Regions:
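Substrate-binding/active-site clefts of carbohydrate-active enzymes
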Residues: 1-28, 50-56, 73-74
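The substrate-binding groove and active-site-proximal loops of carbohydrate-active enzymes
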Residues: 1-15, 32-41, 96-97, 134-144
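Soluble or luminal CAZymes and related metallo-dependent hydrolases
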Residues: 10-18, 42, 46, 101, ...
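Active-site groove signature of glycoside hydrolases
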Residues: 17-44, 128, 132
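Active-site-proximal helices and loops of the catalytic beta/alpha 8
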Residues: 27, 37-121, 154, 171-206, ...
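Structural preference for beta-strand elements that scaffold enzyme active sites
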Residues: 31-35, 62-64, 125-128, 162-163
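Substrate-binding clefts and catalytic carboxylate motifs of secreted carbohydrate-active enzymes
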Residues: 106-178, 192-199, 214-217, 232
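Carbohydrate-interacting/catalytic domains
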Residues: 159, 164, 168-292
């Protein structure tokens, strides 16, 4: 991006200016955090200084950075950023659906958040997404549009902090190859309703309600249950709360066998559900069940 100014983050005057700007935003607007663009290009010592200044302003000030590849712990650690963008799982989300290969995203989730000592980010809070202002919308990326109601339950219940890009709750499309304007359209709810390929607002609202109240989804353990090419299930657990996610990306129905006792409620439909035996899912559907 040659049109953007490149600041010298080794220059003390530049660093002080940036700190003053952040201080001004906190004092004037009481902001709670910052999202740092291309954080992977920033000097690591500057990130440490920024961290110290922001936490001095507010001890719960949130610092999130844009990262793409590599070990995210390089930027996300107690001295630098609180969270980073999880592009590894972003890729795994849409390509697992398109290739009908849920092993890909399951591998990434276990690699990042599993219980083994070698897992990379267990207990950390990465920013999860299926689209944003830099990539094609998920309704464009998915080959089978029927899978749209399945990918958001996965996004909201996998470890991490889920984000929804405006307009995608209506399934609107946008192709990155057509430029930024195609991805960053004017907010027009009526047009979104008319142009979208799937109205996901009810489902996403239910998932948001669960996510904001659920300790299991915010901080719980991640345990895979059943994995096939076109089906995937897992559970999240914390302080007696359990959330079980069942995903069927195939066009045909499938019967899961979670083998989990207790009374559960499907948060999407509001219906009681028994997970102790066989659980039937229609083609391209999902169940998110909670025991509280």
């Amino acid at each position: 991006h040659y049109e953007l100014v490149k600041l010298n983050l080794y220059n003390p005057a530049v660093k002080e200016y940036l700190k003053e700007v952040i201080t001004g935003w906190v004092k004037e607007f009481d902001i709670d955090g910052l999202r740092l663009d291309v954080a992977y290009c920033l000097d690591l010592n500057f990130l440490k200084e920024l961290h110290g200044h922001c936490k001095w302003l507010k001890n719960d000030f949130w610092l999130m950075g844009e990262t793409l590849h590599g070990d995210y712990n390089r930027w996300m650690n107690p001295e630098m950023l609180d969270s980073v963008t999880n592009y590894e799982c972003y890729k795994g989300l849409f390509s697992s659906f398109n290739d009908l290969n849920m092993f890909e995203i399951a591998h990434s989730l276990n690699r990042q958040f599993g219980k083994e000592q070698w897992c990379l980010y267990t207990g950390k809070l990465l920013y999860s997404f299926v689209d944003n202002h830099d990539v094609s919308r998920i309704a464009t990326m998915l080959n089978n549009k029927r899978q749209l109601p399945v990918i958001y339950p996965l996004l909201f219940t996998m470890p991490g902090i889920p984000g929804v890009y405006y307009g995608s709750e209506y399934g609107i499309e946008g192709d990155k190859h057509q430029g930024d304007d195609a991805l960053r359209v004017e907010y027009n709810e009526e047009k979104f309703k008319a142009d979208g390929v799937a109205d996901l607002t009810g489902e996403i609202a239910a998932l948001c309600k669960l996510r904001t109240s659920s300790k299991a989804l915010a901080h719980g353990d991640y345990t895979p249950l059943q994995l096939l090419n076109r089906q995937f299930s897992f559970r999240r657990d914390c302080d007696g709360e359990t959330v079980v996610t069942l995903l069927n990306i195939d066009d045909n129905p499938f019967d899961f066998n979670p083998g989990i006792g207790g009374e559960y409620t499907d948060v999407i439909t509001g219906k009681k559900i028994d997970l102790s035996g066989s659980v039937h899912l229609d083609g391209c559907s999902a169940i998110v069940a909670v025991n509280k």
